[in-house]
Amino acid sequence: MYGIVMFVNRKEELEFLERKWNENKANLIILYGRRRVGKTMLIKKFLENKKIKRASIFC
């Protein structure tokens, strides 16, 4: 499956990020887990339709 990116079963995580995004205050969110489980893809998927000037992502 090289070259194919699958993004499934992340509805709960995306809803959590959306709730935090819509709060009118600063938040620090630490996303952790085993390697190669889709942490970076989750953040990219969440941010793809957001109008932001800058985002810092450390992997």
Swiss-Prot record:
Keyword Nucleotide-binding carried by entry: yes
What Gene3D superfamilies does the record point to? Answer: P-loop containing nucleotide triphosphate hydrolases (3.40.50.300)
Residues where ATP binds: G33, R34, R35, R36, V37, G38, K39, T40
Its domain of life reads Archaea
Question: From the UniProt record, which GO molecular function terms apply?
Answer: ATP binding
| Pfam families xref list | ATPase_2
InterPro entries, per database record: ATPase_dom (IPR011579), P-loop_NTPase (IPR027417)
Keyword annotations of the record? ATP-binding, Nucleotide-binding
Q: Which PANTHER family match?
A: ATPASE (PTHR34704:SF1)
Under what name is this protein listed? Uncharacterized ATP-binding protein MJ0423
Q: Which organism is it from?
A: Methanocaldococcus jannaschii (strain ATCC 43067 / DSM 2661 / JAL-1 / JCM 10045 / NBRC 100440)
